Amino acid sequence: LTLDRASDDTDVAAEIMSGLIALAIDSCCSDSDCNANHPDMCS
């Protein structure tokens, strides 16, 4: 049971992190300076 809970926590943390990264990329790509600095991130 402890192992299941630990893996669930890890999954939740990973989902939160990927969500935050997606938000950061979106906000970067909508900012022209950041977009110019990171063209590989912004399609």
Swiss-Prot record:
The cysteine framework is I (CC-C-C). Alpha4/7 pattern. Keywords: Acetylcholine receptor inhibiting toxin, Disulfide bond, Ion channel impairing toxin, Neurotoxin, Postsynaptic neurotoxin, Secreted, Toxin. The keyword 4Fe-4S does not apply. This is Alpha-conotoxin-like Leo-A1. It comes from Conus leopardus (Leopard cone). Expressed by the venom duct. The keyword Disulfide bond applies. Residues 30-32 are annotated as: Lacks the Ser-Xaa-Pro motif that is crucial for potent interaction with nAChR. Residues 1-26 form a propeptide. GO terms for cellular component: extracellular region; host cell postsynaptic membrane. Belongs to the conotoxin A superfamily.
